[in-house]
Amino acid sequence: MTGWRIIFMGTPEFACPTLQTLLDRTENVVAVFTQPDRPKGRGQKLQPPPVKELALRHGIPVHQPPKVRTPEVIEQIRALQPDLIVVIAFGQILPKALLEIPPQGCVNVHASLLPRYRGAAPLNWCIVNGETETGVTTMLMDVGLDTGPMLLKKTTPIAPDEDIQSLHDRMSQLGAELLGETLDGLKTGRIVPEAQDDSQSCYAPLLKKEHGLIDWQKPAVTIHNQIRGLSAWPGAVTSLGGAPLKLYRSSIGQGAGTPGTIIATGKNGIEVACGHGSLIIHELQAAGSKKMDAASFLAGHPLALGTLLMPHEVTA
């Protein structure tokens, strides 16, 4: 196999379509670096990252250093003589010494329209903040957090009721397509890197459980966006009778009342008054139960009108 020697760095399912694109193009992927296996599930059994599984199926050597910034790992990467390193959702910050190894640089596939939504959770925060459009950017990495020169972008609309899982799946494919176009442009010299305008930047910090706490004093549209943006994790949560209640799917209503009060129930959902407007809950999950639609929930948990949903408190 000829062409640029490429090292791929990525970890979750989101990164797999991009690695698959490199394989489909018969690029010379000489190694894959990914996070160590992690314990998961009730049995806490070690589970390999999805990227590792894909790489091994194709016979690509896999490396899983806990930290890539150590001198030993940097020398290991140098010995592989990469022309280019492709990074997507890797989960570790690359040090300057590593970034300087490949002559063609390190290309990152970032799930936002940079310079907006730099950081760890751009897709979630785009939805939570009510954005109607997002996209993917390829960039040449520098030592900053998603601050390097931009190469190419692809945009995509966000539907008013789209949730994080749907957007995640679409964007993973979009990123893979853009990486292919970026490689073509770099190899032919057609791409001129563009500096980011830092004055237009905003950040998408790592998600915490606290981000899922619902405040019924807020407008219904704000809570609706919170639910669809955080449905995968940590989940939008309120409290019913002192127990946590996770909300997974909702729509916006026109009702009014004391914020947090249940003002209507039926097959269509459970309607709750908010600071402005109302929220109709269509899918939810009580503690110790399965996720279910509102009608199924009401069959086992009849709710009187006027019942108050309270703020939930996060426990360590």
UniProtKB/Swiss-Prot annotation:
Q: Give the catalytic activity.
A: L-methionyl-tRNA(fMet) + (6R)-10-formyltetrahydrofolate = N-formyl-L-methionyl-tRNA(fMet) + (6S)-5,6,7,8-tetrahydrofolate + H(+)
Q: Name one Pfam family in it.
A: Formyl_trans_C
Q: Does the keyword Transport apply?
A: no
Question: What SUPFAM superfamilies would the database entry show?
Answer: FMT C-terminal domain-like (SSF50486), Formyltransferase (SSF53328)
Q: Which GO terms describe its molecular function?
A: methionyl-tRNA formyltransferase activity
Name the InterPro entries on file.
Answer: Fmt (IPR005794), Formyl_trans_C (IPR005793), Formyl_trans_C_sf (IPR037022), Formyl_transf_N (IPR002376), Formyl_transf_N_sf (IPR036477), Formyl_transferase-like_C_sf (IPR011034), GART_AS (IPR001555), Met-tRNA-FMT_C (IPR044135)
GO CC list: cytosol
Would I find Transferase among this entry's keywords? yes
**The enzyme's E.C. designation:** 2.1.2.9
Q: What is this protein called?
A: Methionyl-tRNA formyltransferase
Task: Name the protein family.
Answer: Belongs to the Fmt family.
Which Gene3D superfamilies does the UniProt record give?
Formyl transferase, C-terminal domain, Formyl transferase, N-terminal domain
